[in-house]
């Protein structure tokens, strides 16, 4: 298990290039698909369910790539990117705990969007509460997540599921 409890952007990019958890193990996306600038807190303790939590942030500015194309004249961050950020964090948690394999999102339960992220926002905060971590032949994290923009909760997702797979050939 990696013992650090927070990570800056350069460390997240190293994770994306397979330099944090080892080749063939959990990676974050790089470039435009990395949906966070930092992880401010990660722990196997705490959270709503007492099974661990992760808090991460994304700085918002009007020049972010998605505002230009979604939608011209009505810029808003796509909600699916916030959902993907939550999956990214569950996968990161599994790798951070020392589990092996490549991460894949496996689904979620109920997802609710009750607000939006506009170019005028300053900061998005992602909060993941682990509900269950299975560490057997199958490695899977199940978590609830929320997204806040400038302190106001705007998305929630129940039962986010991410697995780590030593082979994705038959996936």
Curated annotation (Swiss-Prot):
Location, primary (coarse class): cytoplasm
Pathway(s) it belongs to: Lipid metabolism; fatty acid biosynthesis
Record SUPFAM superfamilies: Thioesterase/thiol ester dehydrase-isomerase (SSF54637)
Catalytic residues, chain numbering: 70
Pfam families: FabA
EC number per UniProt: 4.2.1.59, 5.3.3.14
UniProtKB keywords: Cytoplasm, Fatty acid biosynthesis, Fatty acid metabolism, Isomerase, Lipid biosynthesis, Lipid metabolism, Lyase
Record's function text: Necessary for the introduction of cis unsaturation into fatty acids. Catalyzes the dehydration of (3R)-3-hydroxydecanoyl-ACP to E-(2)-decenoyl-ACP and then its isomerization to Z-(3)-decenoyl-ACP. Can catalyze the dehydratase reaction for beta-hydroxyacyl-ACPs with saturated chain lengths up to 16:0, being most active on intermediate chain length.
Assigned protein family: Belongs to the thioester dehydratase family. FabA subfamily.
SUBUNIT field: Homodimer.
Name of the protein this chain belongs to: 3-hydroxydecanoyl-[acyl-carrier-protein] dehydratase
Organism: Marinomonas sp. (strain MWYL1)
Gene: fabA
């Amino acid at each position: 298990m990696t013992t650090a409890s927070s990570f800056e952007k350069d460390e997240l990019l190293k994770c994306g290039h397979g330099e944090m958890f080892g080749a063939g193990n959990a990676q974050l996306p790089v470039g435009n698909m990395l949906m966070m600038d930092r992880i401010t807190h990660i722990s196997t303790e705490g959270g709503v369910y007492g099974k661990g939590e992760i808090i991460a942030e994304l700085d918002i500015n009007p020049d972010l790539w998605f505002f230009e194309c979604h939608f011209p004249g009505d810029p808003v961050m796509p909600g699916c990117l916030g959902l993907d950020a939550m999956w990214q964090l569950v996968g990161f948690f599994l790798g951070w705990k020392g589990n092996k394999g490549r991460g894949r999102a496996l689904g979620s339960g109920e997802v609710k969007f009750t607000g939006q992220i506009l170019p005028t926002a300053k900061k998005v905060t992602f909060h993941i509460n682990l509900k269950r971590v299975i560490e057997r032949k199958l490695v899977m994290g199940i978590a609830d997540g929320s997204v806040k923009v400038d302190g106001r909760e705007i998305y929630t997702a129940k039962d986010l599921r991410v697995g780590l797979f030593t082979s994705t050939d038959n996936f």
